[in-house]
Design a protein with these regions (language model features):
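Bacterial N-terminal signal peptides that target proteins for export
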Residues: 1-8, 144
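Bacterial N-terminal signal peptides
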Residues: 8-17
Length: 227
């Protein structure tokens, strides 16, 4: 009888240990190999309203981007898919132009820690149709837009550091897919990182994306009650 009780006790302890063990983390989904369609974008955007970007290196901190899935479904869904698969992890901000923009998203920076001939030319292997800014959207300070090169626009994006509406509209079309709503001070710190040449903007100290988390949480509520 004693041995039976001991076996029962061992089995109970094992069962409790199994129940208390942390479940294995869910592996990230595979990264996309082609641009999203409007149909596929809808499913991707169902629970994607906010992107929280954590950076390390010369600047430590995080900032959050309110995503404009309704206004720019293709660009937003593509960004969300790349963020969820871990594409941006390890990529650094390769273009820092004070008073203009900070830009990131070139996967080539994962294997380089300084300037090289193809810096700023990398992408995920595909591009997609540029979506003109929706009515009411402007290239305001802290607006977030995709690059407009047909290769780079697959993954590269930038944050405006000033009112660039007139400047960028005269230069071309850049899809606005979000706006920084939390962590503006982190953006300002990145913009202040020393660079090789103020006209080129390659940083002398790296600011690297550690992760981007996508959530359904809306941005902070403004003083007038709007979000």
């Amino acid at each position: 009888m004693t041995s039976v009780r001991r076996l029962a006790a061992v089995a109970l302890v094992a069962a409790l240990a199994a129940c208390s063990a942390d479940p294995s983390p869910t592996p990230p989904p595979p990264c996309p190999t082609e641009a999203p369609s409007l149909a596929s974008a809808q499913g991707t955007l169902e629970d994607a309203r906010l992107a929280t970007v954590t950076v390390t290196g010369a600047v430590e901190g995080e900032f959050s981007i309110e995503l404009f899935g309704d206004e720019a479904p293709l660009a937003t869904a593509n960004f969300v898919s790349l963020a969820r698969c871990g594409f941006y992890e390890g990529i650094w901000f390769h273009r820092i132009l004070a008073g203009f923009v900070i830009q990131t998203g070139d996967p080539g920076t994962k294997t380089h820690d300084r300037d090289w001939p193809d810096l700023g030319k990398g992408g995920p292997g595909y591009g997609f149709e540029i979506e003109p800014p929706a009515p009411g959207l402007r290239y305001d300070p802290y607006s977030v837009a995709m690059a407009n090169n047909q290769v780079a626009n697959g993954s590269q994006w930038f944050v405006s550091l000033a009112d660039l509406d007139e400047t960028l509209r005269s230069a071309g079309v850049y899809t606005i897919f979000g706006s920084v709503v939390e962590g503006n001070d982190v953006i300002d710190q990145i913009a202040a990182v020393p660079v090789n040449d103020p006209r080129v903007g390659v940083p002398l100290e790296l600011v690297t994306i550690a992760r981007i988390e996508i959530s359904s949480r809306p941005g902070p509520v403004a003083s007038d009650g709007s979000s």
